[in-house]
Regions:
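Class I S-adenosyl-L-methionine-dependent methyltransferase catalytic core
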Residues: 1-142
Length: 142
């Protein structure tokens, strides 16, 4: 019997590096200026925040943000931050997260508040791309 990836049910793995081609397609549409959830080695934009900078504490006003946050327990805080920052003038936030429509954050900040929700067909191949993610994904545009 095939075992399921434990990351599907826990916060064991929180950092899922965005597939470059997937990001490039979104960037061609939105022209991102800020990546608030980056490491020095995987930043998708010239302007970025690392864990040391704590993107949750930074101001995103006036930016076009690509946010692929850690998928652990703090995801609620990241979704709230994305929604809150998007309300600032000249700020657009595009959020890549697991498609978990049963969560509190989905109903409080995404459903009926997002400009657009795009469910990704199939499973993204994060990181080195050798295996698909153990969860479906969605792109949320605020």
């Amino acid at each position: 019997m095939k075992r399921l990836n434990p990351a599907l049910f826990s916060s064991v793995k929180m950092d899922w590096a965005t597939p470059q081609a997937f990001f490039d397609d979104l960037d061609a549409e939105f022209h991102f200026t800020l990546d608030p959830c980056a490491s020095a080695g995987n930043a998708k934009c010239g302007k970025f925040h690392t864990i040391a900078d704590n993107g949750l504490e930074q101001d995103w006003a006036g930016e076009t943000v690509f946010c692929n946050p850690p998928y652990g327990r703090a995801i609620y805080d990241w979704v709230f931050k994305c929604w809150r920052e998007s309300r600032k003038p000249g700020t657009t936030v595009v959020l890549l997260i697991p498609a978990r429509t049963d969560t509190r954050y989905f109903h409080e900040f995404i459903y009926h508040r997002a400009c657009e929700i795009r469910f990704i067909r199939g499973r993204l191949r994060f990181g080195d791309g050798t295996a698909p993610a153990p969860f479906p994904s969605m792109v949320v545009v605020f």
